[in-house]
């Protein structure tokens, strides 16, 4: 019985082993001794044990293979000291600043340069705004170390902006002085790379003071641009009692006797409507004994503005009286005939030698350009009072200036 149980156990062990070599069935002799059966049983049992140990070895090797596969798919995950995890391409923060910005470190042999640049780049990295590239200006590397020293030596960025000493900073950096936007470029580069470090280490100014300095500088630039363009003084508001164009636009200076003779002669020969075709040009101040009041309109726009002003308000008869051919005032006429804006022209009594029309507005603003000089003034119509319903009439001939006639009735 014991021999049969051993034989069955050997057969079971022979069938379970996965790597057991194929064996031919042994012939069973009719008469087997106990010693004969023990030998194959022991051999079979040894083989089965070896097969079981081989299976266990294979199962133990499986995690190692999986670890090797994981290491191949994820290099550097096994341990932090592996060579693959220390490669500079995977962890760029291990590069030194000197290797990244070698050009800045090699601009000169100042021993404080490396210390300053390391401190600057480390501060910007901790601040969350790392310096990712070397600033370039005028096709060369911008020396941040020299720029910081020059600006802080003059009191900081705000002081440099207020005093406008960027040209000195440009010279100190050995940059070409022909750069038109050198001040703006240096200011923006300093604000981006160096101003936070200045506030942290020197505390020469605050961001609020910097913004105020920039706004003030911008306003001054606009003011200079405005003053560079010649401006013309337009007439201000006048009393509402004077409806005429002369009073609505304000009084204007007339030709004075101090003007040259040829200019006056040519001005008196031009028609009044020719002033609308004159091109604008700067008004030149001329010497006169009377201080000139404000100009009524700039250059040749006087008559056009008069036409537009009278179009919706005055009847056709008054427009014809206003824009018709008129005679220029005499050169020796005193300046007291100018309207003062106190009462309408039709109700004024003028003491001058001119006979003004009493039917309405009888003057226009004129601007003539002769030989590059613009003359402005008021022309008055010399007409007899006529009813407005009869329409305009031809002006009467000028009164004779000779001796009075001796023919009497």
Swiss-Prot record:
Keywords: DNA-binding, Nucleus, Transcription, Transcription regulation
Provenance organism: Mus musculus (Mouse)
MF (Gene Ontology): chromatin binding; DNA binding; DNA-binding transcription factor activity, RNA polymerase II-specific
Annotated function: Transcription factor involved in monocyte-to-macrophage differentiation. Forms a complex with NPM1 to translocate to the nucleus, acting as a transcription factor that promotes the expression of the genes involved in macrophage differentiation, such as STAT3, STAT1 and JUNB.
Gene3D superfamilies: ARID DNA-binding domain
Biased composition regions of type Acidic residues, renumbered to the chain: 49-70
Positions of the UniProt region annotated as Disordered: 1-91, 233-274, 306-333, 385-409
Protein name: AT-rich interactive domain-containing protein 3C
